[in-house]
């Protein structure tokens, strides 16, 4: 199961530079609110909140900022409220794109997402128009440099905990699970001292689309860049073979 992953570069990764860090912190803050309101402020009893905290720490969010966010979300007078909205559509040459958002204004978000597709010569479709082309999987990303285990030991630890697949990339490892098993596998890896960069439910494409002409490449990048710049967008999944 180890070796080069066909899933490499499937998710449009957000750059962790100064310009993007503010957006990442905004997204994580909203995810903390959603997690606390759904399952309470105690991460020991709230697996989703544990996942968000792990994501926050991987993105170097200060612990006091995380704690303030949890306390604020748990407060009786907290007025923060966000809805999850998912949009599906097509990029150039039929590239399938799924956009996940957390928003306090669905009309604004829908307009911005539609605008991103339009400017890249893509189109928004109906719910379900492309999601059938993806498999929902638990996805755990591990930094090679930070991991003291070798690939074989890490793979066995993950598989013994219930993982479905293990892939080795140039600078990271990827562990895939059934969505319902993500928490158990994450906890087993954490208990073994494995530092996690990310643990989330991901949309993994069943097949990929290659783009070769310059216009299509510019169009898809335009769509992804505009979505990346939108503070309401939390994740973008696509089947472009980058």
What are these regions (language model features)?
Residues 139-242:
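Positively charged, low-complexity, intrinsically disordered RNA-binding extensions
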Residues 1-125, 130-141, 181, 238:
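N-terminal cationic and glycine-rich segments that engage phosphates or anionic surfaces
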């Amino acid at each position: 199961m180890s070796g080069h992953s066909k899933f490499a570069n499937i998710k449009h990764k957000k750059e962790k530079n100064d310009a993007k860090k503010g957006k990442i912190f905004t997204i994580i803050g909203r995810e903390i609110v959603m997690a606390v309101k759904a399952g309470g402020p105690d991460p020991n009893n709230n697996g989703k909140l544990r996942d968000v905290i792990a994501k926050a720490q991987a993105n170097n969010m200060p612990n006091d900022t995380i704690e303030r966010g949890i306390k604020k979300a748990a407060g009786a007078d907290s007025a923060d409220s966000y809805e999850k909205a998912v949009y599906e559509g097509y990029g150039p040459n039929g590239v399938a794109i799924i956009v996940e958002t957390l928003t306090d204004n669905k009309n604004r978000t829908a307009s911005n997402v539609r605008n991103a597709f339009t400017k890249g010569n893509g189109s928004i479709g109906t719910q379900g128009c492309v999601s059938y082309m993806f498999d929902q999987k638990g996805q755990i990303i591990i930094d090679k440099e930070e991991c003291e285990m070798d690939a074989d030991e890490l793979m066995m630890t993950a598989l013994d905990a219930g993982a479905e697949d293990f892939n080795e990339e140039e600078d990271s490892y990827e562990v895939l699970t059934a969505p319902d098993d993500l928490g158990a596998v994450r906890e087993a890896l954490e208990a073994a001292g494995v530092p996690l960069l990310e643990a989330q439910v991901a949309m993994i494409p069943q097949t990929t689309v290659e783009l070769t002409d310059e216009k299509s490449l510019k169009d898809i990048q335009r769509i992804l860049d505009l979505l990346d710049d939108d503070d309401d967008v939390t994740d973008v999944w696509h089947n472009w073979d980058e």
